[in-house]
């Protein structure tokens, strides 16, 4: 069989031939500089590197701080009473504030 020319070089027409250059490259790539096998093939011919512990306990996310229900107590729309028995905010409700904003602008 005659080889045919391609952009990468000479490729034999017969598909079932073994490319010796490819075997030589794999032989050299199969080991590192200390002559230990590198894991290209099966599990038994590999150097055991070890797996990271992916199932270790994870740290929990930070919990949000509790926010007081009177977060806007210092605003101009809400005033609190000074009596100890009643801690409800007093002042205009939302409908009144909306009406004031409409008529002011």
UniProtKB/Swiss-Prot annotation:
GO cellular component term, pick one: plasma membrane
Domain of life assignment: Bacteria
Name by which UniProt lists this protein: Uncharacterized protein Rv2644c
Organism lineage string: Bacteria, Bacillati, Actinomycetota, Actinomycetes, Mycobacteriales
